[in-house]
C-alpha cells in the first residue's frame, strides 16, 4: 500500500501514465504487477468509488481475485468512464445544482452522455490520492481529489 500513496495519476488518463510522486518516474512492470489488495479466501474485495465532489455519494463494487496496482488503476479508470446511473442523479449532484446544470447544458440535455467522471467539477483535474481501508464497512475507498 506504500506504493499506492506514492502514485501521481489523473483518473481521466490511461493507467500507464501514472508516475511515482517521489521520483517523477514511471512505475516499473514489477511495481504495476505487485499486489495492491490481496483477496481473503472467504470474502470478496469491496472497492468504493466517490461519485460526488462533496464526498456525499459512493458506489461500491465487489471483486473476487487479487488486485494488482495496474488492475486497480484500470478498475478506477474504467469506472469513471462508465455511464452515470441516471436514477441516482440527485444523489450524485447533491449540493451541486450549478455544476449539474453546467454539465447538462454542456451535453445539450443528453443525459445518456454523462459518465461517472462528470460528477467532478472542472475547477481542477481529479487525481488519485490513494486507497483507504475502512473496517466498519469492510471496503477500500478510492481517494480522489486535488492534493
Where are these predicted regions, by residue range?
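Ubiquitin system architectures
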Residues: 2-18, 24-43, 53-56, 70-147
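Mature soluble extracellular domains of secreted precursor proteins
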Residues: 46-48, 64
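A short, exposed loop/beta-hairpin motif centered on an aromatic-Gly-Thr core
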Residues: 58-64
